[in-house]
């Protein structure tokens, strides 16, 4: 089971499949496909936007693993969540389908609060301080919660 499948399953159990959205590709115009988020949990005016990063080609070198963490978790994943927030602002409605197969249109007009979470599964040689990192502060989007797969 991939990290994305695991989180979709876990969120489906915790938040019910009606509120969990794991298939979030949308096309704002022909030929342009984007992903809103790896996983989205949506309750009316509140949403949790999640990006998931899994280390597939781990090494035994802790500095290589630290570099992966900095580039993929702190860099790419937080950038992708910033894209999620931008997509919601730029598009009046984005059509998404929940884990029950029901489709909805979501837009920033109805969202008053969005929690930003990055879930990561690093390699065995990932340094302990990376595993213990629980937040990231963005200059433009505030704080992001970081959760290692080991605690969920």
PLM regions and their residue ranges:
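Intrinsically disordered, low-complexity Ser/Thr/Pro/Gly-rich regulatory segments
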Residues: 1-152
